[in-house]
């Protein structure tokens, strides 16, 4: 940028169409967060009406994880072939229809299927909205685009909690799901009123349709075995998260089977760049493993170990959720200032200073605990707002929506594993110590994976002929693309 351009406030670099594109995607992501937490809010009411066991009730939450990876793949491929806008609109309609179906569900099976549909739509919304906004904004503002967008999810969760308190006591739990019709109306408005992403339009102007991840996996020479592996992965995930398996060896075996299938899909779809894709799945997996024990078990910790009443628990959780939302926006500024990877590492290192005090001070001072949680979540959880920008930079425009959607939502299975890990450790330690230990140790794994740019580094080690040296989104160099000690001149920009 020129000196005169740098003196212009960042928000003036955006035209009306770009702001409209962001606003539409942000609202879509807010609705995604809204729909995601509805089942958790009314789970006890649903369990009581349908006569479900605790395991069956919990499986309604896990159902979304079972289908997310496939939704990311399918709707991401739609975004790569037909445009980000259509994929985003389709995702919103899909999770809205699933939410509406939950309201009409006569029993467990119907609601479980509806939750599978919601999971697919959620996954597609993440990949399509993120790529849509990032590719619509100027390159030097794309960390802000990513961070601001992801903040919508936290806002949606807060809105859902408020709507729950107003609707359910008066009209019952089904009325909360009937609100799912509203996003469909919003999606129809989007279809007519927002432009296509600039990067996608430029890449596809006058060119033949690209070969998407769906084409490679389900229309290629290995389509039969890939279809069988898809059903095998879905069945394995169902048994792991909803089948009430008690044998740890069987669960581990099914998890290993899923890992082999997902890596196989990545190898087939990414070609020589499969090491990058596999490492990105690991980055996301550990990102969920360090953050989700606190997300899932913090309410339990506050109620059981600190003996807080429900009102106090709600207040503390507000600090936590609001901190994460603010952190997404702060992360966007940090990313554009320091660079995506450096901002991620610095923010996580700062969060490490706070994680031990959060669980060490006890519950004597609610305000101090709330403030500590606010800043810890702002730095540790909020920085994940620029994760779509980080992942998307490793993929060309032709494969970005499916690549981002698939890698993120496979890694997101860590969100289902994390509470289990926390609970297992809590059998030997108190819950607060378990959460602090798990988060503190696994955060360092993410710091190393991102700080050392392991996706590029492993790519260079295994398949150097397909190495990308520069970020495909903002053209900044990848530190792991050259051996340690090499000068800046070693960077040779690859063709995107």
From Swiss-Prot:
Give Gene Ontology CC terms: plasma membrane
What reaction does this enzyme carry out catalytically? N-acetylneuraminate(in) + H(+)(in) = N-acetylneuraminate(out) + H(+)(out)
A single GO BP: carboxylic acid transport
Recorded topology in the membrane: Multi-pass membrane protein
Give the transmembrane region(s). 22-42, 58-78, 86-106, 116-136, 148-168, 170-190, 224-244, 247-267, 278-298, 313-333, 353-373, 374-394, 406-426, 431-451
Superkingdom per UniProt: Bacteria
Q: Which SUPFAM superfamilies match?
A: MFS general substrate transporter
InterPro entries noted in UniProt: MFS, MFS_dom, MFS_trans_sf, SA_transporter
Q: Which Pfam families match?
A: MFS_1 (PF07690)
User: In which broad location class does this protein mainly occur, judging by the first location in its UniProt entry?
Assistant: membrane
Instruction: Please give one Gene Ontology molecular function term for this protein.
Output: sialic acid:proton symporter activity
> Keywords, A to Z?
Cell inner membrane, Cell membrane, Membrane, Sugar transport, Transmembrane, Transmembrane helix, Transport
Task: Give compartment(s).
Answer: Cell inner membrane
- Function, please? Catalyzes the proton-dependent transport of sialic acid.
Q: Which family does it belong to?
A: Belongs to the major facilitator superfamily. Sialate:H(+) symporter (SHS) (TC 2.A.1.12) family.
Q: What is this protein called?
A: Sialic acid transporter NanT
- The source organism is Salmonella typhimurium (strain LT2 / SGSC1412 / ATCC 700720)
Protein's gene: nanT
